[in-house]
Amino acid sequence: MKIIKELILGTVLILTLGAVAIYSYHTYHYKKASRDILYQLSNQLIVKQGLNEKMSTHLVFDTLYVDGNISKNDDKVLSEIIENHIIPVRTISINSGGGDIETAINIGSIIYDKGISIEVRRLCLSSCANYLFPAARNKIINYGSIVGFHGSPNSDDSKLITTVDGVTTSDPAIKDKIFSEIRKTDKLFYNKIHVSWMMPLCGQNENIGDPDTGLSTYNEKDFAQFGVKNISYTDGEMVWKKSMDIMGIPFAHYCKEK
């Protein structure tokens, strides 16, 4: 009789554990599918906001939400918000396609000096990736969000295709005039935040950038070799890397300073 009871209890326990496992499995995949659907539905709008010509901001407690490209004087706008907000700004939640280099460097310096963290909500490309992202105390990369590099003022002359304000140019005389000072400023900034100035260049030097945008990114290990640390991923690095593969964003590798 005792043996029969033990067998019954064992069977019930196995069935219970099996039911819990099946429920957990379906719940996980349901949540993941729901998240993926919501991501796809919101993706177009979020990207559009990140590429807006004019930057927009709003505050929620200690988080400053920033959307749109970086233009001249945006550093002054952000500085005023940060300095005058009663609650100290702890995090900047960014969604930006990049923009004006000098302004981005100034914003990066503000982030570094204030010890502000950054959350990449969807896009942090070009000058946003070059200067805002590495300057932050902590870096949080959301699901499917891109930290994309495609060069800097210190790119090889043959690959230097954008001016300080983001306007494309191929005139060597113009490039030399515009970039002579900004190249120095670029290196001084990286020296200040203890990050290698080669970070934006390695993917470009490997010629592995996305065919349409020239963008590439790095995994956590390569970021750390440049000096970019304290990175976390909302869904883990492996899930994030898979999302980059799906979107066709290649991973560059660490390279040493010239």
Locate the predicted segments by residue.
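Extracytoplasmic/secreted envelope proteins and their assembly/folding machinery
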Residues: 75-79, 104-108, 112, 130, ...
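Charged, glycine-interspersed solvent-exposed loop segments at helix/strand-loop junctions
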Residues: 157-254
